[in-house]
A protein has these predicted regions:
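Short, well-ordered secondary-structure micro-motifs
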Residues: 53-55, 101-103, 132, 161-162
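Short, Lys/Arg- and Gly-enriched loop/turn segments at beta-strand edges
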Residues: 155-161
Length: 181
């Protein structure tokens, strides 16, 4: 469910929602509850980052761009809290229109707040948990979908290798078939 503050998130959790999309304005108490109950959060912070920078180009008035900046900052501040609380944080794709090419910018944006391995895990094993597809995606294992990328460098040292629409990926394999390389 796409939710931002405690009132909405609490209501959704009480109703059985298992994954909060965004959650930019959730409190420490709500983060603790999500961690305790084993629920997931998919922040997709890059959406707010790009809208804060390009919102005027998309026709948003200055007041909306300012509000988005506040929401962006709040969401980024939550990343470390979610990580330290042990919340499963997935990697989302909630971008619209012309912003979609910026999706992979989420890697470097999160990397400013989290260890690289946690950022990569959010797009692999944690994303699989969010989608209830553990062992099928986000893993190199017998019976998994065999979606793999070969990266030109070490993304644990440089998360930007995972950005720019595959520019640093000489080989991309999906479902066991080479799509690039």
């Amino acid at each position: 469910a796409h939710l931002y503050d405690d009132t909405c998130i609490t209501r959704a959790l009480d109703a059985g929602v298992e994954c909060v999309e965004h959650g930019n304005r959730m409190s420490d108490e709500t983060i603790a509850r999500i961690a305790k109950e084993g629920q997931c959060v998919v922040p997709t912070n890059i959406t707010y980052d790009r809208l804060a920078k390009e919102g005027a180009e998309y026709g948003l008035p200055p007041e909306s761009v300012a509000k988005i900046e506040d929401v962006r900052e709040a969401g980024l501040e939550r990343l470390d809290k979610l990580y330290k609380a042990g919340v499963t944080v997935g990697y989302g794709s909630d971008l619209i229109g012309g912003m979609h090419p910026h999706q992979s910018g989420e890697f470097t944006l999160r990397g400013q707040y989290l260890p690289a391995d946690a950022v990569i895990r959010s797009a692999t094993v944690d994303a699989a948990k969010v989608l209830r597809m553990e062992g099928e995606i986000g893993a190199i294992a017998p019976g998994a979908h065999a979606d793999l990328i070969v990266v030109d460098g070490n993304p644990l040292e440089d998360l930007s290798l995972l950005t720019n629409q595959g520019a640093h990926m000489p080989m991309i394999m999906q479902g066991g078939k080479v799509k690039k390389g």
